[in-house]
């Protein structure tokens, strides 16, 4: 599963930098 996650994470962030930047703080607050 590490392989898929490592490939999906960077690809998603690269394809959706705007969304990633907006979701980043949300995930940090809810995840932590």
UniProtKB/Swiss-Prot annotation:
Belongs to the MSDIN fungal toxin family. NCBIfam families: amanitin (TIGR04309). Processed by the macrocyclase-peptidase enzyme POPB to yield a toxic cyclic heptapeptide. POPB first removes 10 residues from the N-terminus. Conformational trapping of the remaining peptide forces the enzyme to release this intermediate rather than proceed to macrocyclization. The enzyme rebinds the remaining peptide in a different conformation and catalyzes macrocyclization of the N-terminal 7 residues. One of its GO terms (molecular function) is toxin activity. Probable toxin that belongs to the MSDIN-like toxin family responsible for a large number of food poisoning cases and deaths. Residues 1-10, 18-32 form a propeptide. The lineage of its organism: Eukaryota, Fungi, Dikarya, Basidiomycota, Agaricomycotina. This is MSDIN-like toxin proprotein 1. There is a cross-link at residues 11-17 (Cyclopeptide (Ala-Pro)). InterPro entries: Amanitin/phalloidin. It comes from Amanita fuligineoides. Keywords: Toxin.
């Amino acid at each position: 599963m590490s392989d898929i996650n490592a490939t999906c994470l960077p690809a998603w962030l690269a394809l959706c930098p705007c969304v990633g930047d907006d979701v980043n703080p949300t995930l940090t607050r809810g995840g932590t």
